[in-house]
Swiss-Prot record:
Component of the mitochondrial contact site and cristae organizing system (MICOS) complex. Component of the MICOS complex, a large protein complex of the mitochondrial inner membrane that plays crucial roles in the maintenance of crista junctions, inner membrane architecture, and formation of contact sites to the outer membrane. GO terms for cellular component: MICOS complex; mitochondrial crista junction. This is MICOS complex subunit MIC12. The gene is AIM5.
Length: 114
C-alpha cells in the first residue's frame, strides 16, 4: 500500500508542477513569465552588464514615434532622436547603484512588512 501511495503522490506532484510550468511558460506565449518582476530585474541587469542603454522604449507601447541612433563615447551613451534633440543617459555605474539601492529597499520593505 505504501508503494501505491508514494507513486500516487509523486504522480500528483509532478502533474501539478508540469501543469503549472505549462500555464506559466507556454500558454499565452509566456505572458506571466515575460511580465514577472524577477525577469524584468534580470533583463535590466543584463542590459547594464552588456553596456546597453537602460532606457528602452518598446515599439508596441509607443509605436514608431521613437526612432533613435546610439552614440557611445567612453562610458557615456547618448541617444540622438531623428529630430536631432539629444537625450543623454547616465553612466552605467550610476545605473548599477540605482539597481542595487532599489533591490536593497525592496528587501528592507519586505523584511519589515512581516
Amino acid at each position: 500500500m505504501s508503494k501505491i501511495a508514494k507513486l500516487g503522490s509523486f504522480t500528483l506532484v509532478s502533474g501539478v508542477v508540469a501543469t503549472s510550468c505549462y500555464y506559466y511558460f507556454i500558454d499565452r506565449d509566456g505572458y506571466h513569465y515575460k511580465r514577472s518582476v524577477w525577469k524584468q530585474v534580470g533583463d535590466e541587469v543584463q542590459r547594464v552588464i552588456d553596456r546597453k542603454p537602460s532606457l528602452v522604449f518598446s515599439k508596441e507601447k509607443y509605436g514608431d514615434q521613437f526612432d533613435y541612433d546610439y552614440k557611445v563615447s567612453g562610458e557615456r551613451v547618448e541617444r540622438v532622436p531623428v529630430d536631432h534633440k539629444q537625450l543623454v543617459l547616465r553612466y552605467n555605474s550610476e545605473t548599477m547603484k540605482d539597481l542595487w539601492n532599489k533591490e536593497v529597499r525592496a528587501l528592507v520593505d519586505w523584511v519589515y512588512s512581516r
